[in-house]
Amino acid sequence: NADGGDWLDAYTRQEDGFKAGDLLTVGGDNYLLVQRDHRENGVYSRFNAVRCNQTITLGKWVKSTEPNDFGEYLNIFTPYATTPAYMVTQLTGLNKTVIGSVLGGTVAVIMPAYPIDVNVPVKCHYIDSTMEFVEREFTVESMDCTDVNTDAEGNIGGILRLQIKLSP
């Protein structure tokens, strides 16, 4: 049920057990369930959902255990999670075509919750205006964990909101 742009209302059967932070695939697009509407009728749940417009990879830099040909121990990007996410620049609003070309400022990210620290490297993958596959690296500046939760088994769930900045 679309209400414009990248956002829509998603209705799920209550017995399906969907919750904020879950991903749904509809017609080849990934949608992130962001917020549950508590006006339910006992049969279905209604969520605000956003169409994911990027795939991001979370990782960490690890110093190589072996020197290169010049005797240097290089830092190697080691990914630990790849997920669909919704990214928006503060300058472009919902215009997702400009996200990859941000040269300054910050980018807001809404994504499923993962263990993450400030300053963790985030790689964004997209196809630019010339139809080339591009990867850019960002660094997490701040995060909002208000809607992140942990269940009895220690599994992290919910929605994580980040502010990221293009790495130098």
Predicted regions and their residues:
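Short, conserved turn/kink motifs that form compact alpha/beta structural patches or helix kinks used as
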Residues: 1-168
